[in-house]
């Protein structure tokens, strides 16, 4: 396997294409609804426990979607903040209406408001919480959210109000940088204590949480994971006008703990450069991280992988991958260069990797398929290169 895209001198894990793993079939399951309906409107479940379901294809559940609001007290002298939290969840019903995110982006893979399935996990559903990108929206990575939901996970994505497709000022207020990780905390708090009588009440297992983020959501992900902030760099951004509405009270927020201890593994996708953390801030992270990038979207993942020394860090790079490989789809922005990897082919590489990593680190899955992928003895595809370094 070629390693020319990466800087020399690092430990490369040889990833072997294994015919015993059914990853080659993943793209066959990527189109259309996850389930044909059976006679009573339900979807039959595959036999066996959830950890026996192959990560290479969607799981046996349909993907439900709904939205709840979360309100929390903000630091830095700001008023209470209310944000919508989008939820994708396992269902046995694949019927009815599809969600349309921001009234613009339809999602044919999810079903609005269908009943929540009983949890296949005795302790409740494990959770993936996700942070969208700059000028994004909660449903930007809905294909990943539905993939996890099909395998029996709850997926939650807060809409980062003030930094979405319709309401982002330039320059960004400093508060956005602490609101993002606090929005994630609020989303998890909502799952821990939903409205009384809500079907989600008591159903989320908040001891088993993974976190992912796309683009600017990578900043959120590292902050949630415990990266520490460089006060000098933040002051320089304020003084230079790169961020707005800086106050002493708001700068002081970054000296507090903005991490989320419930997150047991993190997946930053399609971004690696953020000087809010300084040279050493990443090394404060104490949970495993899966850094994902596309070869056609150089964001400095190689430099970050080389620089970080204190983190259990895996770097996965997808040949032909563009910025929206981890969001709306690899070809979504219309760049002709991105056509080399179709949306469906891209999803069939990214989604199984994220699921496998979450199962390995959050659910302690050491089955042959998952451990082979995460530990490096097998691969989804020759298009995927992976590298690992221990702290």
Predicted regions and their residues:
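Bacterial signal peptide processing site
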Residues: 29-31
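Domain-level recognition of soluble alpha/beta enzyme cores
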Residues: 37-128, 150
């Amino acid at each position: 396997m070629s390693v020319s895209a990466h800087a020399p001198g690092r430990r490369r894990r040889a990833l072997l294409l294994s015919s015993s793993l059914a990853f080659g079939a993943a793209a066959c399951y990527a189109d259309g609804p996850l389930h044909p309906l059976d006679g009573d409107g339900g979807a039959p479940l595959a036999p066996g426990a959830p950890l026996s379901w192959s990560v290479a294809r969607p799981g046996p559940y349909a993907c439900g979607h709904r939205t709840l609001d979360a309100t929390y007290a903000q630091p830095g002298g700001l008023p209470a903040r209310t944000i919508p939290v989008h939820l994708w969840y396992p269902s046995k019903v694949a019927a009815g209406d599809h969600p349309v995110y921001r009234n613009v982006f339809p999602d044919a893979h999810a079903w609005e408001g269908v009943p929540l399935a009983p949890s296949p996990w005795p302790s409740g559903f494990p959770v993936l919480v996700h942070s969208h990108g700059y000028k994004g929206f909660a449903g930007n990575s809905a294909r990943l959210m539905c993939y996890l939901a099909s395998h029996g996970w709850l997926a939650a994505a807060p809409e980062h109000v003030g930094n979405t497709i319709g309401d982002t000022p330039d320059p960004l207020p400093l508060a956005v940088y602490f609101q993002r990780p606090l929005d994630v905390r609020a989303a998890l708090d909502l799952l821990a204590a939903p409205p009384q009588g809500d079907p989600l009440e008591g159903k989320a297992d908040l001891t088993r949480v993974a976190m992912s983020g796309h683009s600017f959501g990578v900043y959120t992900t590292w902050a949630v994971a415990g990266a520490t902030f460089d006060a000098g760099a933040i002051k320089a951004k304020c003084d230079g006008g790169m961020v707005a509405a800086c106050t002493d009270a708001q700068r002081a927020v970054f000296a507090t703990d903005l991490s989320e201890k419930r997150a047991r593994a993190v997946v930053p996708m399609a971004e690696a450069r953020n000087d809010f953390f300084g040279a050493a801030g990443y090394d404060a992270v104490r949970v495993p991280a899966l850094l994902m990038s596309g070869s056609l979207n150089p964001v400095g993942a190689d430099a970050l992988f080389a620089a970080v020394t204190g983190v259990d860090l895996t770097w996965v790079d997808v040949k032909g991958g563009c910025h929206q490989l981890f969001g709306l789809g690899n070809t979504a922005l219309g760049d002709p260069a991105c056509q080399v990897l179709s949306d469906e082919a891209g999803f069939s590489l990214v989604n199984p990797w994220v699921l496998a990593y979450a199962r390995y680190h959050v659910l302690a899955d050491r089955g042959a398929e998952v451990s082979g992928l995460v530990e490096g003895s097998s691969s989804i595809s020759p298009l995927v290169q992976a590298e690992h370094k221990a702290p």
